[in-house]
Amino acid sequence: MPTLSFSPFRLLLSLGLLAAVLVAPADAQERSNEDARVSPNAAVSQTIGTTEVRITYGRPSVNDRTLFAEDGLVPYGEVWRTGANEATTISFSDDVTVQGEPLSAGTYSFYTIPGPDSWTLIFNGIANQWGTDYDESEDVLRVEATPESGPQVEMMMFYFENVDDTSGTGVLHWNETRVPFEI
């Protein structure tokens, strides 16, 4: 019976390939998303002047719930992930001002603290995180914005208005609440 002989290099290469073949399916299963999310992901981008602004977020639905209230789904005065699932992110390709305050180019997680007359918009330095993993010590900027009434929107959305070559207005809109912020 012939003996198989492997050089150390061929043996290591064979073991490495075997490990890659066995690990790849496990990794693929962990990352698959065969089931549709209840709150689907969305993204919107807008060029303002020469600056690219991109917001990526999960879109929760109203589903006949009370949203923004003392006893609502999103209680007044508490930090909210501003969407569903992973933390909402907002990216700026260049340095900008938000509500008149400077913010460096980069990607930030975006949280809010809703209130009946004023919302706090939070730009947090940890961009890739689960939405509930908020760490206040990583906040880069907090600004205030005034909520407005708007037409009913079932699924939360972001969009841009009043865009010209130097500025634009980002808008968070869910149910009958709009929160515009100047960029």
Feature annotation, model-predicted:
Residues 9-10, 34-35, 85:
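Hydrophobic alpha-helical segments, principally membrane-spanning helices and signal/leader peptides
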Residues 29-74, 78, 127-183:
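Primarily secretory-pathway and cell-envelope proteins
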